[in-house]
């Protein structure tokens, strides 16, 4: 019963309330409502569970794309990680992440930059981590090409992302909401073909798990979780 009520209310907000507020008062929505919506979603139990599955696999010199306010920091294993470069275009979120980094004995260098132009040398990173980030990067393909460039020849990409469902009905919804959903979600696109983007960047996916997140709308909760080699 709780799940049904949640889905009804969340759909009400996604399809009616948020769009009305966003298109009538953009500044208020993006400053007062959107940040708390994103933070709440990123902190939800199903999302945190996915982070916990993949982040501990990181090793050596790590690049985290879209580090945001540092939701992943508590899942890194300090004994396996020598340094983390956290890339995010938001100064405000980087400041929040800095406060968290000191709690977990991690050496983190926060870089305010877009993922499409990573200011790091070629072949300098052991592990790249992306979690629920590619959906909101304007040019995800360019970002993945950049990740490929900075990874060492033995480097690994670790990812957990949501994207295009293989189910036609769900995919039709994902494609159908493109005209408004990115505008109310901070640029998130629900219909990105994550495996295709990764392989187009010349990565070899060696492990891939797919699923629908429990207690979430299927059109926002189809998950691609795995690893890829350079």
Write out the residue ranges for each language-model feature.
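Short alpha-helix
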Residues: 186-202
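Conserved beta-strand signature within the Rossmann-like core of class I S-adenosyl-L-methionine
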Residues: 154-162
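Class I SAM-dependent methyltransferase SAM/SAH-binding core
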Residues: 63-117
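A short SAM/SAH-binding and catalytic strip from SAM-dependent methyltransferases
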Residues: 126-139
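A short glycine-rich, Lys/Arg-flanked "PGG" loop and its adjoining helix->strand segment in the class I
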Residues: 141-153
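A short acidic, Gly/Pro-enriched loop at the edge of an enzyme's catalytic core
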Residues: 116-128
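Core SAM-dependent methyltransferase catalytic element
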Residues: 203, 208-230
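Conserved alpha-helix/loop element of class I SAM-dependent methyltransferases that forms part
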Residues: 41-61, 71-75
